[in-house]
Amino acid sequence: MTSVLLTRPLTQVAALEALVTNSGHQPLLFPTLEIQALKAKVKCKHYDAVIFISANAVEFGLEILKKITYSAIFTVGVATAKKLNDYHIEVDDFPKKNPSSEALLALDSVSCLRDKKILIFRGRGGRETLRIGFEKNDNTVEYAQVYDRVICSLSEQHQKSLDVFLSGSKGFVSVTSNENLDGLIVLAKQTGQLDSIKNYPLIVLSARTKSYAQTCGFQQIIVTPDISDQAIASVLE
């Protein structure tokens, strides 16, 4: 049985854990990040466009969204759009393939925005691609930073999962973002096992994370066909 080291936050890993188990592999939980809510305030009551960066942004930004009005709502990808749909909120548009800030900016429905007030729901920090892109068209951009990603403290669970994982000659490591990978590196360094982990294939969700992983010294990297949990499970076969 092949082991799969799952680095998602514990609150978000259950579905992927079940898929890995059902595919005949052994999931090992190694959460690298905790998602913590931030108190955010917005300046306006109405925005021409509202954008959600991630499913976490939806989860933690929903209360603010209920208190404002907006003309259009966009997401960076299908998973975030689905999260809004789960709350019966209709999304106007999102990139259907290769979800990214660049792909969102390239949409006809988004590139036409000019002289508009735009609110972006996101986590603390992150890339400035959207802000820069929108400001080129004289839009006013505001952030609602509604959550933070904090690297987990090393626990007995981490050590136990890692010991089981490294005892096998075959295995995969699944990471879902650059920040997720940063957390893995920090925790692996604390255990003294980073070089050992780099001997195993790393499963990532995008070419951007692949490039970042390469700069971090990972060489065996598999990019999933899309960002779904099913896509992660499919590359294990």
Annotate each PLM feature.
Residues 1-237:
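Signature of uroporphyrinogen-III synthase
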